[in-house]
Design a protein with these regions (language model features):
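Basic/aromatic-rich interaction segments and small domains that mediate binding to polyanionic partners
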Residues: 2-70
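Long, low-complexity intrinsically disordered regions
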Residues: 66-82
């Protein structure tokens, strides 16, 4: 993986959930270095809304995907707000 790659979180873990990030959310790698297996990933929302989080995600907890749809992140957020 490298900076600017689009990724999807493939696990549900408490440490990510505390940041508001859940399985299925999509983000992009926003730092060019991997530190001890972790990449800094930004999870945004659609349009001009504030980002959900920018947090370190272990490379085994995500997969690279061809394109991002931030609206997907908003749908997942709503499921956890209920």
């Amino acid at each position: 993986m490298k900076e600017m790659d689009i990724v999807e979180l493939i696990v549900e873990k408490e440490k990510y959930a505390k940041e508001g990030v859940h399985k299925g959310m999509q983000g992009w790698i926003c730092y060019d270095k991997c530190v001890r297996g972790y990449w800094l990933v930004n999870f945004s929302q659609y349009g001009e809304k504030d980002d959900i989080a920018t947090t370190s995600i272990h490379e085994t907890d995500m997969k690279q995907i061809p394109r991002m749809d931030a609206r997907n992140n908003e749908v997942i957020c709503e499921q956890f707000r209920e």
